[in-house]
């Protein structure tokens, strides 16, 4: 489609009809983005400091090969960042206003798996890396239908916006996620669903508020364990 412009592609769901001659097979090499099962992609213009999200079901792969052998040697920093990206996908899908009985089981199972396996995956446990590879795929199927929230909105807007350099997407998500949970939990339905997540992963608390706080504290503990900065300033952004 040589007649198609990039500006057109940046308009959601405006892609021309694709794959009339060939099928699209996607094979993920990290355990986080779940691009192999979603209708979303991102192109970053570092010169302009802009990340362009692309959204169209025409870019959803026809076939996904989720092979955990491909992440056996993934560096631990990428394990941390992509793992927190997967967790953010699942949590935002579960709390999304577009959640449904079809997306909830995928999202909550992905959350449980990330809580169970991400620290061990970071520590080079191969069984845990396999499970994380599956978890991120489940999270992708959830958010591709329920969509995401302001964690991702901010991560996309700020990922390439600063002169001090690019903030990796998963790192930005990990930084923002605890703050967004705290902010969103002022809305009763969001608090209820965050508290439900906390209960499902075995966190304590005698009220929904205390359960949400326990969830925030657990996510922050993951970040500390995997050496993820708490703020943009800690990452190195000085503006």
Describe each PLM feature range:
Residues 1-69:
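Glycine/threonine-rich beta-strand-loop-alpha-helix active-site module
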Residues 32-33, 138-173:
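Glycine-rich phosphate/pyrophosphate-binding beta-alpha loops
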Residues 40-146:
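Carboxylate- and glycine-rich phosphate/diphosphate-binding segment that chelates Mg2+/Mn2+
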Residues 94-99, 146-148, 182-192:
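Short helix-capping/linker segments at secondary-structure and domain boundaries
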Residues 105-109, 113, 131-134, 149, ...:
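Amphipathic alpha-helical interaction segments
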Residues 161-164, 170-238:
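Gly/Pro-rich interdomain helix-loop hinge
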